[in-house]
Amino acid sequence: MSSDSKKRKPKVIRTDGGPQEGKRGKADGEQDARYYSEECEVDLRDPIKDYELYKETCQELQRLMAEIQELKSRGVKDNASEIDERRVQSCVHFMTLKKLNRLAHIRLKKGRDQTHEAKQKVDAYHLQLQNLLYEVMHLQKEITKCLEFKSKHEEIELVSLEEFYSEAPTEISRPDITLTEPHQQTLARLDWELEQRKRLAERYKECQTIKEKILKEIEVKKEYLSSLQPRLNSIMQASLPVQEYLFMPFDQAHKQYETARHLPPPLYVLFVQASAYGQACDKKLVVAIEGSVEEAKALYKPPEDSQDDESDSDMEEEQTTKRRRPTLGVQLDDKRKEMLKRHPLSVTVDLKCKDENVLHLTFYYLMNLNIMTVLHLTFYYLMNLNIMTVKTKVTTAAELTTAISAGDLLSPDSLLSCLYPGDHGKKTPNPANQFQFDKVGILTLSDYVTELGHPYVWVQKLGGLHFPKDQPQHTVTADNSLSASHMEMTMKLLRTRLQSRLALHKQFASLEHGVVPVSSECQHLFPTKIVSRLVKWTAIPFEDYTELPYTKDVVEAGLAEDTHLYYMALIERGTAKLQAAVVLNPGYSALPPIFSLCLNWKGERTGSNDDNIRAMESEVNVCYKELWGPKPGYQLLTNQLQRLCMVLDVYLETEPHDTTVEGPKEFPQEKMCLRLVRGPMRLKPFKFNYPQGFFSHR
């Protein structure tokens, strides 16, 4: 074996020499010939039989290799011939395996070629399909365009078929043809439409001729009426004493309307709509115009060019050289004043109530901000902001009783706050004003509302101004319809707000003296004898209210805001003291007050640790509709306080007696109750039943 390998080794590694290359070329040619012959042979041979031959050859090789291994393992020299014989047989089998391998590769190549050809055909068919689909889509689009095509005659509104056949002459309608052919029917209807339009054109010319004649007559009458003006003026002057005597100030109203011509558009819209509403629906509504007409006229006059003499110009130059330049702060102050400048004219509205109490409203217009404000109700116009503002002032027929806790009820800052939900009047409703504020260093308009008035949203709507939030606009035109749609509801809300605040003002005066006023109409809501009494009623700031531990739930629920009014009531009976923190919504009495309770008796008891305290809060906060009393419900607050005194009596009298303490019970039971407690929470009977006079559970 070693000698044979040494002889074969040079043939394997030798790579140079001409004869070898020649031999290699000849072998390659023979191999190509065999390749082509075997390629043809593949079609004639059965792959399954080749597979069986492959298996048999492999088995035979395994057998021969095993025999060679066995013969070599014996180590007998006579076995060399047998080993050579089996080696030759093995080589023959290897040649067979090589041939089968070549045939398998040829079959694989043919399979791939056939697959590639089939794939090319499929791709060609797919491309043809895509082309056909594109042509179909193109044809469908063209068909859709044809179907959607609209002729000019389709835009013409033709008369109905019934009118066409009843009114059109037979020469045009031709019913014997058009009833069966839609195309001829459409043509006939178009002919009839043309005929009608020709007639209308002739009629139009006739009307134009008549119109010109009437216009000439109107001009003649206008000239005649203009000649009457001097005579009418003299008659009006002569009738002034009669007007004053009969309380019919026609001349004064005429002058006011002349003054209204100089109002800015928002104030003019407000004046017209408020006057119309007063004449039609509210005779106690008085509308007037205040301010300087001359200053208003000067706003719309173009500035006159002044030509100074040479001496004057020299003097000015000398003064300017000596004068110091204004600082940046002074310039900003001047710009702010100019920015917040009000229109010289304002509109005042006086709302009179049945008890002769008067709410004065003054409306201003901030021209630069384009919003409205209120004080006296006096309405102003800020010219540069293009907004309106208002100031308030309340005049009462009789002097009100002084009440410390009622100080904020009629103040201008809180009287009209949240007349509509969320309308605090502290921010400008015009989004464009923020850009103007940034230029002059104004952080917010709330710093100037005391001087300018409050720019409530409802004030802008009364002036016909609407500012869209999504598209800020520097200039907004006044809309009469917007003002008219909000006038009636706003005036009713203003009168209701004034009456409710005046009622609260009177009630607070009694509450500060420890007296809970209950009208005769509401006496049936309470028992005859109530021992608990109100000993203290004070106003508290918003910050103190939020710091109370038993008001946490109300604050977290968003029911307490800085625009609301806050009060503290103290109710006592013996050693028991009940503290009630009250949130008064600006919309009282449409929105009820909210009570938060804390009882100091044998410890501190609140709604979080005592179910009966929570039930007492429910009696005044949830069941408030029983306490409204006669409309419009201005006695709700006092009735709630009276009910608190009542339920405190029930709470204390139904509390079980402590046997460890000697002596009589501190709070003997005086109220008649069907059951003292009920349910696992041991709730007490807080509901008063009239006219039986006993207490029961809800």
From Swiss-Prot:
Motif Nuclear localization signal positions after renumbering to this chain: 6-9
Key words, A-Z: Coiled coil, Cytoplasm, Differentiation, mRNA processing, mRNA splicing, mRNA transport, Nucleus, RNA-binding, Transport
GO annotations under biological process?
Answer: cell differentiation; mRNA export from nucleus; mRNA processing; RNA splicing
Q: Which residues form a coiled coil?
A: 80-246
Q: Could you tell me which residues belong to the region Disordered?
A: 1-32, 298-327
GO terms (molecular function) for this protein are: mRNA binding
Here the segments flagged for biased composition (Basic and acidic residues) are 21-32
According to the UniProt record, where is the region Tandem RWD domains? 246-698
Where does the record say this protein resides? Nucleus; Cytoplasm
Bias class Basic residues marks the residues at 1-12
Quote the biased-composition stretches of kind Acidic residues, using this chain's numbering.
305-318
The terms describing its cellular component in GO are: cytoplasm; THO complex part of transcription export complex
What quaternary structure, including any partners, is listed in this protein's UniProt entry? Component of the THO subcomplex, which is composed of thoc1, thoc2, thoc3, thoc5, thoc6 and thoc7. Component of the transcription/export (TREX) complex at least composed of alyref/thoc4, ddx39b, sarnp/cip29, chtop and the THO subcomplex.
Q: What does this protein do?
A: Component of the THO subcomplex of the TREX complex which is thought to couple mRNA transcription, processing and nuclear export, and which specifically associates with spliced mRNA and not with unspliced pre-mRNA. Plays a key structural role in the oligomerization of the THO-DDX39B complex. Regulates the expression of myeloid transcription factors CEBPA, CEBPB and GAB2 by enhancing the levels of phosphatidylinositol 3,4,5-trisphosphate. May be involved in the differentiation of granulocytes and adipocytes. Essential for hematopoietic primitive cell survival and plays an integral role in monocytic development.
The record's comment on protein family reads: Belongs to the THOC5 family.
What name does the UniProt record give this protein?
A: THO complex subunit 5 homolog
Q: Which organism is it from?
A: Gallus gallus
Q: Give the lineage.
A: Eukaryota, Metazoa, Chordata, Craniata, Vertebrata
